Amino acid sequence: MALIKLARQLGLIDTIYVDGARPDPNNDPEESFNEDEVTEANSVPAKSKKSRKSKRLAMQPYSYVIAVDFEATCWEKQAPPEWREAEIIEFPAVLVNLKTGKIEAEFHQYILPFESPRLSAYCTELTGIQQKTVDSGMPLRTAIVMFNEWLRNEMRARNLTLPKMNKSNILGNCAFVTWTDWDFGICLAKECSRKGIRKPAYFNQWIDVRAIYRSWYKYRPCNFTDALSHVGLAFEGKAHSGIDDAKNLGALMCKMVRDGALFSITKDLTPYQQLNPRFVL
């Protein structure tokens, strides 16, 4: 009865009376207006934004991410001939603490291309990478070995696990992130296949930040810089510098986490394969 009375007072429901049958409000307890009750009903506190944000942070499965953004050989305004496949020339990765927003470790190596050893003028202008820089770089195979050692040390130091590496925590608490699926799904996969390089299995699953960005913000950015600008961030460094792109991707991830976005693996090339933790740790 109390709920019905309150609903009437708030104008949510109406009672229709036959002519002459309407009671005197002064004598009808259900029709009498109790200001204290309405005030009390309107003052029931909703969950604060802070509490909702804390709850979503608690639901976030990853406390760390590894942001990767390869730079590769490229040519202007034309598809390269069949023998001109894109080769990685910059291999950057940054380990980002999503709780603090800080970059805690970096991996950065320039890679020597073998299939197209001479960089195009367009590639140099776009990436800022000079010919002498890649000439003194290392083969991709060597860089992957060095990266695996770096990854092992950083994960051990923080007790981190990647997705599918631990049966008791299949999600892990750290994941690779990229902007689109190109870096791992196309560039690295194709080059390793062509050159017979053993690609670590942990490169087979990652988070495409662009996919989650589009879903969360209901906005389709025209490029990465536009994505940053739309959420109030400015690109820091040089665009198409792999290490700068990776750092800005980490900053965007932290912003999205603060805004309440939840992240999960968006791409898994080997969905039924579990990682061998000994290969990483």
Swiss-Prot record:
InterPro entries documented for this protein: 3-5_Exoribonuclease (IPR051274), ERI-1_3'hExo-like (IPR047201), Exonuclease_RNaseT/DNA_pol3 (IPR013520), RNaseH-like_sf (IPR012337), RNaseH_sf (IPR036397)
UniProt EC number: 3.1.15.-
UniProt keyword annotations, A-Z: Cytoplasm, Exonuclease, Hydrolase, Magnesium, Metal-binding, Nuclease, Nucleus
Cofactor note as given: Binds 2 magnesium ions per subunit.
Gene disruption: observed consequences: Results in normal embryogenesis but animals remain in the L1 larval stage until death 4 days later. Results in altered histone mRNA 3' processing and ultimately levels of histone protein expression. RNAi-mediated knockdown results in lack of adult flies since all die as pharate adults; the animals seems completely normal except for their abdomen, which is undifferentiated lacking the characteristic pigmentation and bristles.
Gene Ontology molecular function: 3'-5'-RNA exonuclease activity; double-stranded DNA 3'-5' DNA exonuclease activity; metal ion binding; nucleic acid binding; single-stranded DNA 3'-5' DNA exonuclease activity
A single cellular component GO annotation: nucleolus
Binding residues annotated for Mg(2+) 1, in chain numbering: 69, 71, 245
Acidic residues composition-biased segments: 27-39
Top enzyme category: hydrolase
Residues that hold AMP according to the record: 71-72, 240
Entry cofactors: Mg(2+)
Domain Exonuclease: 64-262
Region (Disordered): 19-52
Subcellular localization(s) per the UniProt record: Cytoplasm; Nucleus; Nucleus, Nucleolus
Family: Belongs to the ERI2 family.
Chain's role: A broad-specificity exonuclease, capable of degrading both structure-specific DNA and RNA targets without sequence specificity in vitro. Requires two to five unpaired nucleotides in the 3' region for efficient binding and nuclease activity. Binds with higher affinity to RNA and DNA stem-loop substrates compared to single-stranded substrate. Binds to the 3'-end of histone mRNAs and degrades them, suggesting that it might play a role in histone mRNA decay after replication.
PANTHER family attached to this UniProt entry: 3'-5' EXONUCLEASE ERI1-RELATED, 3'-5' EXORIBONUCLEASE 1-RELATED
Name of protein: 3'-5' exonuclease Snipper
Species this protein is from: Drosophila melanogaster
